[in-house]
């Protein structure tokens, strides 16, 4: 009877979905989730803990996170006349946006493959989602994108810049054409911009329907779950109406502000990751049968020989390293695996496991 009652009351589109699953990484070198591999020094950790000791966790946090926002505006060089809304990770910001625009016949457009949460949250909210296939080299099919925008008149267009899971950076001219052709919101998701050196932040003043999304997850603060969405105040004002109160907790606000007081350390970590990325790309390119794709992010997508991705992924995991198997998604990602750029030791362990796994 319980199963029947659940089926009766849970929306059919929810029942058709699968819950987001995270692989168990216990006792493994974790190179599957695009996390920053570096931690703080013992001295910095002690200073951070001292700051946390002063937090009154019996009180609700500042609902507007005003002090943190001021620090973020400086760090991100947000134009003075633009506004910002914070989310419990970028996922919550995506949900806020789609909650605000959802309605009968409304649609969402994004190139694919891309960040899976665009599609998943759109489906959760009953929006029509239209993915536009990238070309075989994962470049943007601009004519196809523009045609779909004309036909579907989307409420929101998402562009990951650089793209996830492919790692490449679409051209600024292509994004500009998409922005100018779009009738609704365009959200440029810059989760990995710190590794690419490119941003649409200065263009917020040029387009009143452009929002730029960032996160602190890729610069070593994934555990805080903090995302930022920035743009024209008129949009932010409406999105504030769907934001749950106190969504950014006390510890996240204090910890993020503390981290942003040491920007040199964050920038140095990004520089180290970019250097390690280039070294890892060169090493992968030397392996016969492995096709390596360009990356402007903190991960590398590579293609295995046909029908070998699952076996290679399993062999690497058996040797103590967890990466991401994307082959099961099919389409352009068939035979593809993705590895996060780790420390020198982690990257060495991955390459050793990959070489050994390919021989079996």
Curated annotation (Swiss-Prot):
The keyword Cell inner membrane is annotated on this UniProt entry: no
Molecular function terms, GO-annotated: histidinol-phosphate transaminase activity; pyridoxal phosphate binding
Family: Belongs to the class-II pyridoxal-phosphate-dependent aminotransferase family. Histidinol-phosphate aminotransferase subfamily.
Entry superkingdom: Bacteria
Cofactor requirement: pyridoxal 5'-phosphate
Organism (species): Nitrosococcus oceani (strain ATCC 19707 / BCRC 17464 / JCM 30415 / NCIMB 11848 / C-107)
Name used for this protein in its record: Histidinol-phosphate aminotransferase 2
Pfam families the record matches: Aminotran_1_2
Gene name for this UniProt entry: hisC2
């Amino acid at each position: 009877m319980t199963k029947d009652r659940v089926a009766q009351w849970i929306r059919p589109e929810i029942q058709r979905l699968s819950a987001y699953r995270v692989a168990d990484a216990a006792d493994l070198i974790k190179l599957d989730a695009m996390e920053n591999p570096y931690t703080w020094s013992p001295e910095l950790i002690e200073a951070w803990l001292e700051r946390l000791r002063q937090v009154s966790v019996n009180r609700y946090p500042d609902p507007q996170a005003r002090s943190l926002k001021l620090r973020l505006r400086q760090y991100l060089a947000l134009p003075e006349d633009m506004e910002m809304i914070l989310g419990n990770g970028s996922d919550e910001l995506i949900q806020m946006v789609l909650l605000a625009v959802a309605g009968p016949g409304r649609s969402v457009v994004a190139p694919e493959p891309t960040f899976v949460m665009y599609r998943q949250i759109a489906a959760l909210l009953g929006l029509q989602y239209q993915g536009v296939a990238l070309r075989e080299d994962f470049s943007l099919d601009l004519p196809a994108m523009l045609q779909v925008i004309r036909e579907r008149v989307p409420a929101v267009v998402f562009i990951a810049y650089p793209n996830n899971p492919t790692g490449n950076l679409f051209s600024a001219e292509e994004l500009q054409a998409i922005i100018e052709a779009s009738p609704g919101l365009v959200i440029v998701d810059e989760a990995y911009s710190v590794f690419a050196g490119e941003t649409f932040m200065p263009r917020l003043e040029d387009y009143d329907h452009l929002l730029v999304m960032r996160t602190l997850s890729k610069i070593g603060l994934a555990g805080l779950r903090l995302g930022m969405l920035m743009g024209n105040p008129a949009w932010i004002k409406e999105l504030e109406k769907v934001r749950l109160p106190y969504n950014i907790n006390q510890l996240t606000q204090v910890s993020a502000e503390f981290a942003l007081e040491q920007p040199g350390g964050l920038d140095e970590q990004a520089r180290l990751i970019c250097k390690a990325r280039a070294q890892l790309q060169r090493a992968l390119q030397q392996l016969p049968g492995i096709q390596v794709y360009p990356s402007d992010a903190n991960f590398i997508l590579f293609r295995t020989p046909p029908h070998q991705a699952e076996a290679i992924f399993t062999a690497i995991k058996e040797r103590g390293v967890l990466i991401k198997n994307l082959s099961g998604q099919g389409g352009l990602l068939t035979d593809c695996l993705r590895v996060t750029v780790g420390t020198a030791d982690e990257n060495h362990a991955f390459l050793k496991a990959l070489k050994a796994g390919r021989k079996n």
